């Protein structure tokens, strides 16, 4: 297990993208993100793997995730990974969406990308509330029943 960390690409991708921001700043070009995970030694799954293949074979981002170049363009890979833009943009959903626009298209278009933009914005907006459960929400009302 030490030699092969397993197939946890959703975590590895987040950490790779954060590392790129740390090294190159918030205006890092899309190629720096694409090349970072394409050349990384960890295993990938579905749309991430297809994007890696495309990048390593000359199809640059963002076309690496386009449906014409990837049968996984609508997969949920970016949706799963999109927590990091929201966590890096607390209370700033537009900033999270800008990150998603740049990075999400490396591996996804269509539903996979839209889901990622939504998730990133939700994570970002979570920082604007001091209530984890709305008082009038169904779960809270159900939980309070005797």
State where each predicted segment sits.
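Structured, active/binding-site neighborhoods that engage oxygen-rich ligands
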Residues: 1-146
């Amino acid at each position: 297990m030490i030699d092969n960390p397993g197939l946890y690409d959703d975590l590895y991708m987040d950490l790779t993208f954060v590392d790129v921001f740390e090294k190159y700043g918030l205006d890092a070009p899309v190629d720096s993100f694409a090349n970072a995970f394409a050349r990384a030694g960890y295993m990938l799954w579905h749309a991430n793997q297809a994007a890696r293949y495309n990048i390593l074979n000359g199809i640059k981002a963002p076309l690496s995730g386009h449906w014409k170049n990837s049968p996984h363009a609508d997969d949920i890979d970016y949706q799963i990974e999109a927590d990091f833009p929201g966590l890096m943009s607390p209370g700033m959903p537009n900033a999270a969406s800008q990150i998603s626009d740049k990075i999400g298209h490396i591996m996804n278009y269509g539903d996979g990308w839209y889901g990622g933009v939504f998730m990133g914005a939700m994570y970002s907006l979570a920082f604007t509330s001091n209530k984890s459960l709305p008082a009038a929400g169904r779960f809270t009302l159900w939980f309070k029943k005797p």
